[in-house]
Amino acid sequence: MGPVIGMTPDKRAETPGAEKIAGLSQIYKMGSLPEAVDAARPKATLVDSESADDELTNLNWLHESTNLLTNFSLGSEGLPIVSPLYDIEGDDVPSFGPACYQNPEKKSATSKPPYSFSLLIYMAIEHSPNKCLPVKEIYSWILDHFPYFATAPTGWKNSVRHNLSLNKCFQKVERSHGKVNGKGSLWCVDPEYKPNLIQALKKQPFSSASSQNGSLSPHYLSSVIKQNQVRNLKESDIDAAAAMMLLNTSIEQGILECEKPLPLKTALQKKRSYGNAFHHPSAVRLQESDSLATSIDPKEDHNYSASSMAAQRCASRSSVSSLSSVDEVYEFIPKNSHVGSDGSEGFHSEEDTDVDYEDDPLGDSGYASQPCAKISEKGQSGKKMRKQTCQEIDEELKEAAGSLLHLAGIRTCLGSLISTAKTQNQKQRKK
């Protein structure tokens, strides 16, 4: 479309584009803010007569006082404030705030309680001695403490039943067969969702109708809340104490293992059991175990032979000597010989301690002797013990290296014997 030419000023004012252009031109000419605001008003008021401008209210009073609510009074005529807490049937009976209860003479007995149905059920169950009620007793408790429901429509009972069956905060408890308490099942509060109900009860105001009854006073409700808080705090304290005890026991055990000496009954135990019969002359049976075991009762593991020490040794020694776990005794036993006899060929490596060895009565049965260390506690200082442990560790490592080399030599010899025997058998079969 081309530009509109030949239009009258009245018609230009009726069109929106012309109205905007005219308003902007007037604002540009005037320059001041109040005049610009007046000029930016719709042209429909300017087209009318001057009497229409006189009927408009002057807005200068807005700048005189910033508090616009001083002349207004908030009374009971205002709309009720809807609480943000809703339950499953909250649309039928909304919960209101304290603005509805400023006239207790008029609305004391007939006013709606500020609690949702879930909170009403919770208060009824908590008020009972057994903390569980059937549906009929919940109805009667609500009617006794909130007279509003006596004249209310009967739909509130359906709301109570729906909350009991659909709300996760409540759970059904079956009646015991031995007791005859009537028909139906009992309802109680789920302990998992109990803190949520307590928190919702804190946010709700106390109504004047409920405060008239002594059993449902604000003091009673606050006492119920405090009791539940104390229970929750006790449970949390018990959990925290148990966790701290576990942490402390683990830390103390670590400290005891590193700093405190071992008791007298603890012993160094090594596995020294070997096979005493071989079906093949080249078979070698080796059973290895950890070098140290700090087990008090030697019956816990039947593969370990108990050997007690009379002296207390630091756990640091056991941790360092655990490096010598390769220190084991290896024995090579031929086919036509018994363990411990004169014809047996074997290599023995024992722990070198700073005491004399005693005769082992189990030496003929294939067990290597493990002497008991007899060290006087008073005559030796800590430095001597450290030096002795270092020397023993070095000797144990040397013996372990020698035993490993000896074992490697035995295995190579056995491998060569087996290979030659196989080749001879193959040659005989070919012939």
UniProtKB/Swiss-Prot annotation:
BP-aspect Gene Ontology terms: regulation of DNA-templated transcription; skeletal muscle cell differentiation
GO molecular function terms noted in the UniProt entry: cis-regulatory region sequence-specific DNA binding; DNA-binding transcription factor activity; DNA-binding transcription factor activity, RNA polymerase II-specific; sequence-specific double-stranded DNA binding
Listed InterPro entries: FH_FOXN2, Fork_head_dom, FOXN2/3-like, TF_fork_head_CS_1, TF_fork_head_CS_2, WH-like_DNA-bd_sf, WH_DNA-bd_sf
Location of the DNA-binding region in this protein: 112-208
Region ranges (Disordered): 364-387
Gene3D superfamilies associated with the record: Winged helix-like DNA-binding domain superfamily/Winged helix DNA-binding domain
Subcellular location: Nucleus
Assigned keywords, A-Z: DNA-binding, Nucleus, Transcription, Transcription regulation
Main location: nucleus
GO cellular component: chromatin; intracellular membrane-bounded organelle; nucleoplasm; nucleus
PROSITE patterns, alphabetized: FORK_HEAD_1, FORK_HEAD_2, FORK_HEAD_3
Function description: Binds to the purine-rich region in HTLV-I LTR.
Name of the protein in its database record: Forkhead box protein N2
Native species: Homo sapiens
